[in-house]
């Protein structure tokens, strides 16, 4: 792993032969509040690519960051139709995914196999969910965040999942324990059931000053799921 990141394992199950599917990396929206996030994420991608098989790249699912946290806070104070807020949060992930693709120099794709000539890409989450009735199969509400969406992507691809967040898990434990502690969303244990490989990573360094108030952390205990 990169010297910029620390990592750990949440789940590993033997599945015989290694999968050629790209490793799904959920880039926590809270990381987007760091002024150095493109360099950090780029270093993480490079480290994963070095350690993986030559034909296995990465597929990034980018969280919504501070904008989604603002939607969540506003909805708690002035409740709106759940379906509308659900769609709004997913639309924000489309914007953060577009930005990540631009700043990292990666293709933005609606399906992993559309990354022509590039093993690593950023997923256009709204476009991906809009295909094959995926959006309709996803529960509506704040119990589902980019954590669960990334798990659904990994399950669909038969891939592993790396959760890149601002802080490490509060304690060792299974997915249900992490959901109970607020490190992943409440639906994540269900979404992640098919996955054989789940790991985490977080930056080793103290974050530089946030960019104009962006960022998804609501303190260490909440961190978590943006």
Feature map (PLM): residue ranges:
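Nucleotide/pyrophosphate-binding catalytic subdomain
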Residues: 1-210, 218-220, 225
